[in-house]
Amino acid sequence: MQIASKAPCRVDLAGGTLDIWPLYLFHSQPVTVNFAVDIYAKCVVHPRADARIVLESRDLNVKEEFASLDELRAAPQVRLPLLARALEYFSPEHGVEIVTESEAPAGAGISGSSALLIALSMALNKLTGHNYKLEKIREIAQNIEARVLRVPTGSQDYYPAMYGGVSAVELNVDGIRWQPLPVEPAELDARFVLAYTGEPRNSGINNWGVMKAYLDGNAAVQRNFDLIASIANEMRHALLKHDWAETGHLLREEWTHRRENVPGITTPLIDRLVCATRHAGATGAKVCGAGGGGCVLFLTEPDARERVRDVILQAGATVLPARVAARGVSWLP
């Protein structure tokens, strides 16, 4: 018997980084707004009759084996730490073979690692019979990722992977709540273009730099996040009203403030893309995730979408054939 699952990646619209504790506690009604895309992280878990552990990432072309879970735990270094730490936590009684594959380009900033951890944690949850609820799976996955990265991680990335669709993640003193937004996937599909700049980035480093600046009392960063928090709430209301002109404007404003937080969030190519697509009819653009390269989201009216796409290709970036993923983590045959 094998257990196979997949979970979608996400594109963040507004409010990112505020989902890292304790930053959201410093703002009134903090929220992040995002949507799931049909770029998937997949995993297959094969139980074994012996104690052997086999871990394989097909997109990274890495495979490693251990005689047992105890040997894995004792290993001074592993090449696939997300897989190893998740397996350590769920601790199956027998050996397993885990094969994963991510469709997200390297360093894309669309939470490929978070989607992978949700898919893998769901499969291991089923294998071991723990029967954890989705919110508990989110907590486990988030803590495993922080343990591997050794920097704080936010919560928003896991919700699109769990539930799909367009959503707001409310960040409150009494907990985190996921709220679906009634936006038809086709309505957003006709208005967004996702480009990959081919520049890997490290979200942990960029997010940590921003977070440290905030907590150290950097007034400019704190002011930027006051504005970003306000924009995220306005973005939510614009989506509820299906006001796409305002949504594009807010996306542009979000990026204007975000790019000022720390050096390295933007790049010359990203700046060229944002400028060129604006002239081609894009209503807004921002980097996905923490920045420093990776993917850039562009919003546009449907009649300008092809022009925007062409300009992106001419500038040397890649357009990813992404659509809204209406469904979150699911089982594969």
Feature locations, PLM:
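Short pre-catalytic strand/loop immediately N-terminal to key active-site residues, enriched for Gly-Thr
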Residues: 104-108, 283
